[in-house]
């Protein structure tokens, strides 16, 4: 099987809703105002604990506090559909979301204040089933109960349609069980409400589910089906995965559905702060990885991707100072 060559990806190897978002935004605003007299305070809006992005935000917050002298608050929200406009409005200083979610949010809501910091790491994902079942491929999901809807992560449905398309399936071919976000979908899976859930590799929740149900399996995606998938979502690709503690559920070398995870801010954040954020995470990668193994894929060059969202001037200066050119999609 020929997978896209990803030298950076090998670094991964290791030896409801709206109301909740607004409440979180209010709490964050109070925190930021109370800290105005302090040195520097940043709020990082992310998803709920147990998600890949929450762990990533926690790692970044720790490094920024310990290495860059910044006071940082990690602010969980219901999902990426909340995080992006929250950050654009300046109610959070930094946000983390996948590239598709960012593209759609900007296209639909005209978030003119949103500014990109960079692509922090690839986002490898999968449909997971119980290891005790005979289900092994995406085609086996036909007629099964599968998480769907994702009202707080609206673009996940687009990704799921792309993955189903690799085996000639559509959402109509599965029994859809509506959930607000991936964490709730995993909880429903544990409770027996669905046959398959969708999540990113490296998230603590995946490890938790694996231990709770006695083992899970990542469903295989046929490379031949990627042409059909790209008609749904052009930026998705298969990246190599092998059995190891990061890729829980991978039983043999296979390709896993992947795209980029982005770090972004807004136009009101000072240039020197954004510059300091990038400089700190690049220089202290080893510290980040102790908390979030997915950040093994982080590189200064990898941050600077081509995207429809404009870069923050602080990021532009960092890339210019370090002679880092822009690259195309992975």
Which residues does each PLM region occupy?
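Ligand-binding clefts/hinges and TM-proximal coupling segments of bilobed small-molecule sensing domains
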Residues: 151-162, 237-307
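Pocket-lining segment of extracytoplasmic ligand-binding domains
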Residues: 98-101, 108-109, 133, 170-177, ...
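Acidic, polar ligand-binding/catalytic clefts
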Residues: 88, 92-122, 204-207
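An extracytoplasmic/periplasmic, membrane-proximal ligand-sensing/linker region
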Residues: 183-184, 191-192, 200-218, 223, ...
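Sec/Tat signal peptide C-region and signal peptidase I cleavage site
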Residues: 33-39
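Bilobed "Venus flytrap"/periplasmic-binding protein-like clamshell domains
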Residues: 40-67, 72-73, 123-191, 285, ...
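N-terminal secretory signal peptides that target proteins for export/translocation
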Residues: 1-16
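Extracytoplasmic
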Residues: 69, 79-82, 89, 112, ...
């Amino acid at each position: 099987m020929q997978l896209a060559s990803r030298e950076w990806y090998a670094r991964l190897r290791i030896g409801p809703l709206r109301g909740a978002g607004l409440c979180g935004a209010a709490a964050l605003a109070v925190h930021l105002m109370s800290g105005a007299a302090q040195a520097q305070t940043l709020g990082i809006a992310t998803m709920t604990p147990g998600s890949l992005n929450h762990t990533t935000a926690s790692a970044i917050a720790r490094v920024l506090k310990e290495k860059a002298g910044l006071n940082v608050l990690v602010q969980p929200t219901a999902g990426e559909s909340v995080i992006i406009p929250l950050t654009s409005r300046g109610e959070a200083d930094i946000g983390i979301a996948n590239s598709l979610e960012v593209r759609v949010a900007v296209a639909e809501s005209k978030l003119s204040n949103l500014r990109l910091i960079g692509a922090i790491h690839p986002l490898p994902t999968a449909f997971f089933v119980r290891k005790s079942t005979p289900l092994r491929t995406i085609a086996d999901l036909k007629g099964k109960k599968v998480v769907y809807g994702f009202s707080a992560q609206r673009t996940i449905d687009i990704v799921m349609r792309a993955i189903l398309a690799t085996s000639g399936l559509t959402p109509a071919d599965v029994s859809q069980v509506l959930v607000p976000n991936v964490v709730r979908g995993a909880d429903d899976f544990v409770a027996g409400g669905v046959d398959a859930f969708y999540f990113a590799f490296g998230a603590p929740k995946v490890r938790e589910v694996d231990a709770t149900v006695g083992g899970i399996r990542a469903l295989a995606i046929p490379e031949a089906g990627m042409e059909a998938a790209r008609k749904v979502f052009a930026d998705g690709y298969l990246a190599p995965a092998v059995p190891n503690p990061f890729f829980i559920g991978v039983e043999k070398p296979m390709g896993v559905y992947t795209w980029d995870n982005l770090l972004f801010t807004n136009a009101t954040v000072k240039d020197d702060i954004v510059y300091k954020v990038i400089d700190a995470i690049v220089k202290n990668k080893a510290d980040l990885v102790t908390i979030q193994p997915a950040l093994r894929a982080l590189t200064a060059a990898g941050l600077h991707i081509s995207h429809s969202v404009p870069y923050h001037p602080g990021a532009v200066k960092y890339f210019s100072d370090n002679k880092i050119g822009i690259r195309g999609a992975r």
